[in-house]
Amino acid sequence: AYTCQELKIPATIFMPTTTPQQKITQVKFFGGDYADIALVGDTFDESATAAIDYARRENKTFIDPFDNPDVISGQGTVAVEIFEAARQEGIKIDLLLAAVGGGGLISGVSVYAKHVSPETKIIGVEASGARSMQAAFDHAGPIKLETIDKFADGIAVQKVGQLTYQIAKENVDELVNTDEGLISSTILDLYSKQGIVVEPAGATSVAALELIKDEIKGQTIVCIISGGNNDINRMQEIEEKSLIYEGLKHYFVVNFPQRPGALREFVNDILGPHDDITRFEYIKRANKGTGPVLIGILLSNKQDQAQLIERLAAFDSKFIDLKGQESLYNLLV
């Protein structure tokens, strides 16, 4: 979008209908009068297909967002700046991590990095719910994933490019993946400790450090933070996923005796002194001795979980921990 306005070249930019509003606003801001936005499809791949069809119908040039030599080269300039800064400081980079979606960034960065510093290890980081580059590595070529999770929407791609796959296969040393809970905790850490606002896709490289922390002690590491389009409206969701990942927030279905004082007993006997109830849903049933309650509990310390489970079992031996009930759990989180 910025290039369109800078070079005075009109363009139509296709994005999924699920694109966060903040990202749409930024595209409008940088594109100005030279960038029209078309929101089509629920995923990146559906939107890309629509863009290709539109370009054919209207006799326009389609520019792939990642599987294009010029796009790859442009993203590779990030590595040029990184290694030039390292050279000026006399620093040897042992490890470089970058997010992987369609593969444009990791391709451009890795091919330059291996040219100027062959000993630098390159790790590509995918979201656990959208491991399209790993699928390409496993099948000796790009394949389309049937479904993907769109939490890290900036890298939620069903199929990587042919060119990006070839470059990554040759230059990337390892692929790892990070789940949405770890990504969420990383987003909050970057904001609270460093004042950095980052979207889920942009946080993946830093999140991956948790996975390899025992292997990288004493090394010089660069994480490319690629994307700050974090819609403030998503922060509640991100905090929720982080608390669950950290083992602090839990959801249960517990059978309560249908008599006065049952809730008071639960609070006094089950909760720790610093624990909190974050959700409580209950409908009293007539002519029944007990009734199911959906309850969310926030612990002050994740080490208290085992004791909480023991007390819950004593209160209701048939209670349900919804973390093991994926279909129900996803309705809450």
Predicted regions and their residues:
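Glycine-rich ThDP/TPP pyrophosphate-binding loop and its adjacent helix/strand module
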Residues: 83-115, 119
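Glycine-rich beta-alpha junction loops
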Residues: 67, 100-104, 126-131, 151, ...
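Small/polar-residue-rich loop-to-helix segments that shape phosphate-bearing ligand pockets
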Residues: 12-95, 126-179, 183
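Buried hydrophobic positions in well-ordered alpha/beta secondary-structure cores of metabolic enzymes
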Residues: 4, 27, 63, 82, ...
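Active-site-adjacent helical/loop segments in soluble small-molecule enzymes
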Residues: 161-219
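Catalytic phosphate/nucleotide-handling subdomain of diverse soluble enzymes
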Residues: 210-240
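Alpha-helix C-terminal capping segments
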Residues: 1-10, 108-117, 207-215
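A conserved regulatory-domain signal marking ACT and ACT-like small-molecule sensing domains
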Residues: 232-333
